[in-house]
Amino acid sequence: MLWIILAIIVFIVAATLLLFRLEDLSHLDRDDYPIKDATPSEANREVLGRIRELGQSSKGLRGKARLMALRKHMDGLSEGIELASELRHCESPRGEWVLAPGCDTRRRILYIHGGAWAAGSPRSHRAITDRLSQITRAAVFALDYRLMPENRFMDGVRDCREAYKWLLKHGPDGAEPVDFMVVAGDSAGGSHTLGLIAWIRDNGLRQADAAIAFSPSTDLTLTA
């Protein structure tokens, strides 16, 4: 009986490698980046401290408890930060409008947060969306897309698509056509951003006027 189980496991692994083998992107790696002899800035030390805090927030936990701790920590990242923007909850599509004083509601940004597709929310990224609305004078819609593992990856993708179509015709005050449209996101949200604009192109929708992908996850083969 044992050898049958082992044979099945070997077959599954072999079939996976054969059918889902992806391109090796390691040839794109570079090792000639210039190294500057400089003292790390205070901002650099603060970022490293935040990363350490993220690891400490779930130390000793496993499984669902670890994930819940990470989510709670991320949602607290913007706590205590003074925001200039008005925040408005939106039920469908689920998300949050971030409106800096004097922003033009016909100028819109769909912001897709990061968090490894399993954490993060409009709340966790308010420091970013608040600043974006101020700088661009645009109404920012931070999408609260469905996360894994409670949902499938494609559920989050579909949420992004539906939100984009909705934003073309709706602003924070109701039905209103868009004049200028941007899609932006960080990390996992940056990956969703790139996938979304390709889908927009392939489906003949009004294309975004700009797309911003902050540190997007682009190589899921993990070879580069």
Question: Residue spans of the language-model regions?
Answer:
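A glycine/proline-hinged amphipathic helix-loop "lid/cap" segment
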Residues: L2-A100
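Alpha/beta-hydrolase superfamily serine-hydrolase fold, recognizing
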Residues: L6-V10, L17-E23, G55, A84-A224
